[in-house]
Amino acid sequence: MTNIVANYKTFLVKIVVLAIGKTDESWIQEGIDKYSKRLKHYIYFEFQIIPDLKNRKNLSESQQKEQEGRLILKQVQNTDLLILLDEKGKEFHSKGFSDFLQQKMNAGIKRLVFVIGGPYGFSAEVYAQATSKIALSKMTFSHQMIRPFFAEQIYRAFSILNNEPYHHQ
């Protein structure tokens, strides 16, 4: 596979991370902001928050997933590549994840949309629309904690693709 080690802005690729619910803690938001700012050097990157459901406490788990699913799918365009962060997804080491991103960008995808679901995961409709599922770990993390972890992993992937010293083998 040919490596495209360049500023991906040239190819108009955009990475969007969708997350359900506002970020609860300022230190979590600081982590997201830190890596979002660093990523702008490489690619168009956006972290979008889908507002919490109103009356969430009065909804069943399946109702929450269905309603959140509708909100997620409203944000997704027909040409997007929808990738879910899911505990049953494929696990990558950092180099493998950078290769995964490279492959998607080389395929001419204009928007890679990664979704961090709510506390109960995703609706069947969201699973049906997704092209891939990835897992960051076999361990379970809150949907809040995953936000800065995943932003850092995307940054790490781009540092690997650009042969920069951030990642150590």
Regions of interest found by a model, annotated:
Residues L12-L39:
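N-terminal beta1-alpha1 ligand-phosphate binding loop
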Residues T23, E87-K90, G118-G121:
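Short glycine-rich anion-binding loops that position phosphate/pyrophosphate groups of nucleotides
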Residues V17, I83, G117, F150:
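Conserved RecA-like P-loop NTPase ATPase core
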